[in-house]
Amino acid sequence: MPAQVSHIIAAEEALRLALPELAETWGIGSDWGLAKDCADDRAAAWFRFGAQGPDIFYHNQRTKPSGIHYGALAHRRNYGLAVEAMTAALIEAKAGFDSREAAWLLGFATHAAVDRAIHPFIVHFAGWQSPLIPESARYRSCHPFLERLLDIHILGTLRGLPIGSCNLEGLLPLGGRERCEGSDGGSFDAALGRLLAKGLRAAFPAAAGADFLIERRIQNAIADAKYFIRVTNPSLTSAGSQSLLPWFDDLSGWRSMALIYPEKLPTGLDVANEEGKTWEHPAGDGRSYTASHGQLFDEAIASAAAALILVAEAIAEARIGAGFASAIGNGGLSVADEDGIPVPPRVSKPLPLKEVMEEEFARRIRAEQGLAAGRV
């Protein structure tokens, strides 16, 4: 799945395309000049956080009860049903575009389009570990590392910025649970928990319908996602600040690079397929492409913009039209067949990402040792 920065940029570009007046109202433009201020109380920040979609559940590995299984479910099926139910809830609550709930939901509505467009590309070029193929162990941790390389690529392409200048604490609401109030006066994280619970119960009645802890799981996922985003913030990418990373030391090994942003793309490696080489869909069903990451990103923006228009029109008209959920899409967000049914990956041609990670790890260890020597 694309990482945090890619989802933010795709959502912003989709909003500027679909709802330019709202983008202007929220201060979302082609640069991040407003990102220097604390983001906690701004609609734009919650829109960007919503764009992280159900990925927040994958980060829910510190706080119990966990909702990590909802991340897997939401990536497999019924995303459109979840968005439809939450849109209906906002219509019933008469929540307008000035509410944080609406801002978050609009962001959430963009997530599926971005995953569907780009995730197969990532799987093809990163590979995966199979327990049946021992030599595939080299590909473990390469997937999230490629996600971060593609963040670097798209940030440079569409924002003209180096990754080290990207401070997510200025773009996302990463404060504590009680920093922002919801429309009912309580914690906004709690309000968000109630809204997302309605979406999950509509999409996954068997799993979520009787889950009396679902709102607590969602709040825990939000808290853990905020923590994860803070400690993997691209602004910590430089060798001078890597000592702030809680998992990095000389014993952590090359796999510890999986969640760390290199300062620049590796020389001589076409991570974005800008040369237009043919690659196969990892489903192994004969689909093949020559699209670059940038071209796929443009497709993702267009599809996300269509989703934004659907949700915005429904809220503005206080009515959900026929076919809403299917237009958002209920198929899988990762490797799926042409009908959207999730299938295991079968075909890939991985880039030499392990070697890049090993080189990056060695470089950072040398830099850390140099810093340590300077402190003596």
Label for each model-derived stretch:
Residues 1-107, 112-376:
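N-terminal leader/auxiliary helical segments
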